[in-house]
From Swiss-Prot:
Compartments in which it is found: Secreted, Cell wall
PROSITE patterns assigned to the protein according to its UniProt record, in alphabetical order: FAD_PCMH
Record keywords, A-Z: Cell wall, Disulfide bond, FAD, Flavoprotein, Glycoprotein, Nucleotide-binding, Oxidoreductase, Secreted, Signal
Name of this protein: Berberine bridge enzyme-like 17
InterPro entries documented for this protein: BBE, FAD-bd_PCMH, FAD-bd_PCMH-like_sf, FAD-bd_PCMH_sub1, FAD-bd_PCMH_sub2, Oxid_FAD_bind_N
Domain FAD-binding PCMH-type: 69-246
Signal sequence, renumbered to the chain: 1-19
GO CC terms, sorted: extracellular region; plant-type cell wall
Family: Belongs to the oxygen-dependent FAD-linked oxidoreductase family.
Enzyme class per UniProt: oxidoreductase
PANTHER family per UniProt: OS08G0158400 PROTEIN
Cofactor: FAD
Gene3D superfamilies reported in the protein's UniProt record: 3.30.465.10, 3.40.462.20, Uridine Diphospho-n-acetylenolpyruvylglucosamine Reductase, domain 2
């Protein structure tokens, strides 16, 4: 009996000790933040804890996937909405010294919520207030802070020049920090490549709280954060980017065709020609289930979106020669400036003011979603497409985006940056399912895995490649506080192919103790 009482007392003492250890860590962390920052740049107003009435709203404001939200997460210690670079430095140093993990959030477009969730004690380092943009028209360059959105960047570029642009994504609310570090895919890809192909310098806070840039950054680290994801190596503060030339007149179109209108034949032909078209032309195909002629019956429609760096007359000639099956008409085409195409890609009516590019999220995410990705090396047989359509028709709301490669992407070596998906790809697929009822989550996740399995014979293999910016936990993951090298090799080989080993070597040099880690981070080579 005495032994039982002793054991119970011991358990109680350990429990009390654990509870008391957690609280001092929080207090020590907050005290450290105040001590590590200059009073001229006070950090107090940047810190949100569970005691703040605005804590929950701060947490959800920059998270766009309701599936990943957990406002009552007891592991979340604080949110630091940095307003000065020194706040970032202090957060890194203080989190490390107190054994607290960091999640870095810029635009909140993390498809699996890895930038704002964790199963171990953590803080969110929110970058959205660091949003300065400086344009140098003469040098055709810009500095853009990690918290600036792509819409803000595009607006600033257009205000400075009508014939300059940046090769980035079409979504205006993407944060520059995460979007660029994961690759940065957009509709200028065939002409100019992806975002990381135009990064020439960066400012990054390392594991010791130092700001590395220029000569101190190191060519190996600059290589790694261009496509390897910055959050494995430090905190991206800003990027120095090269801008690209665009003509004063750019032409866009959007054409829909259904199964009943023979879209399967058109899409098969699209596979044969889309990566071989002139590199000034980007022609996306977007299959999705829609209501048929009879409302109770669904069919498949494919929306063909195009952007051409030139006139409608030249575009019509190219399309009539290469894809007459689409039946493009002159009235389908709209000529406009490059900046105005950015609203077109967001499905705004033609002529919508580009001021919408400056809109930022003001509340919690309204929908749940799941995304996956694939790379296609050879055309999917026409007779096999029926299987794909059947799998898609099981969803209430999903679509694919078939994004063409070719052009300059065939000329950039796979190891030029950490982003490896270059020559040999016809197109990249994004799968996207959207729903609003939490009770439908299980079913939709199952359907996404089903269609991903259905597509296996038609996509890359050994490994089955994946795009880092379309974060997908299904391709492999580690627990928040651990790093299993064998598991890391699984997702690392899919995201980075032959570049994964070099990424681990860079990681070992700049973060040997693996402080910057999360479920799909890059482990140091020393873990081998």
């Amino acid at each position: 009996m005495k032994e039982v009482v002793y054991v119970l007392l011991l358990v109680l003492l350990v429990s009390v000790s654990d509870a008391n250890e957690t609280k001092p860590n929080i207090e020590n962390f907050l005290r450290c933040l105040r001590n590590r920052t200059n009073p001229k740049n006070p950090i107090a107003e940047a810190i949100y804890t569970h005691e703040n009435s605005t804590f929950a709203s701060s947490y959800v404001s920059y998270t766009n996937n309701k599936r990943c939200l957990n406002p009552n997460d007891t592991k979340l210690i604080a949110i630091v909405a940095a307003k000065h670079e020194s706040h970032v430095q202090a957060t890194v140093v203080c989190a490390k010294s107190n054994g607290i993990q960091i999640r870095i959030r810029s635009g909140g477009h993390d498809y699996e919520g890895l930038s704002f969730t964790s199963s171990v004690p953590f803080v969110i380092l929110d970058m959205h207030d660091l949003r300065s943009i400086t344009i140098d028209v003469f040098r055709k360059q810009a500095w853009v802070d990690a918290g600036a959105t792509m819409g803000e960047l595009y607006t600033k570029i257009a205000a400075a020049s009508k014939t300059l642009a940046f090769a980035g994504g079409v979504c205006p609310t993407l944060g520059a920090g995460g979007h660029i570090s994961g690759g940065g895919y957009g509709n200028l890809i065939r002409k100019y490549g992806i975002s990381v192909d135009h990064v020439v310098d960066a400012r990054i806070v390392d594991v010791n709280g130092n700001i590395l840039t220029g000569a101190t950054l190191g060519r190996d680290l600059l290589w790694a954060i261009r496509g390897g994801g910055g959050a494995s190596f430090g905190v991206i503060l800003s990027w120095k980017i090269n801008l690209v030339d665009v003509p004063k007149t750019v032409t866009v179109f959007k054409v829909n065709k259904t199964l009943e209108q023979g879209v399967t034949d058109v899409l098969y032909k699209w596979q044969l020609v889309s990566s071989k078209l002139p590199q000034d032309l980007f022609l996306r195909a977007m299959p999705k289930p829609v209501n048929g002629v009879v409302p109770s019956e669904k069919t498949i429609a494919v929306v063909f979106y195009a952007q051409f760096l030139g006139s409608a007359r030249r575009l019509m000639a190219i399309m009539n020669k290469n894809l007459p099956e689409l039946g493009l008409k002159r009235e389908d085409c709209y000529e406009m400036s490059w900046i105005n195409t950015t609203t077109f890609w967001q499905n705004y009516p033609v002529g919508t003011s580009t001021s919408v590019l400056l809109d930022r999220p003001s509340g919690p995410a309204g929908a749940f979603y799941k995304s996956k990705s694939d790379y296609v090396k050879k055309p999917i047989p026409k007779e096999e497409m029926e299987k794909i359509w059947k799998a898609m028709l099981k969803f209430n709301n999903m679509w694919m985006q078939w994004n063409p490669y070719g052009g300059v992407m065939d000329k950039i070596p796979a190891d030029a940056t950490a982003f490896p998906h270059r020559k040999g790809n016809l197109f990249k697929i994004q799968y996207f399912a959207l729903w609003t009822d939490a009770n439908a989550t299980y079913a939709n996740l199952g359907l996404m895995r089903d269609i991903y399995h259905e597509m296996e014979p038609y996509v890359s293999s050994n490994p089955r490649e994946a795009f880092l910016n379309y974060r997908d936990i299904d391709v492999g993951s580690n627990p928040s506080g651990e790093t299993n090298l064998e598991e890391a090799k699984i997702y690392g080989s899919k995201y980075f192919l032959g570049n994964f080993k070099r990424l681990m070597e860079v990681k070992a040099k700049y973060d040997p103790e693996n402080f910057f880690r999360f479920e799909q981070s890059i482990p140091p080579a020393s873990a081998m």
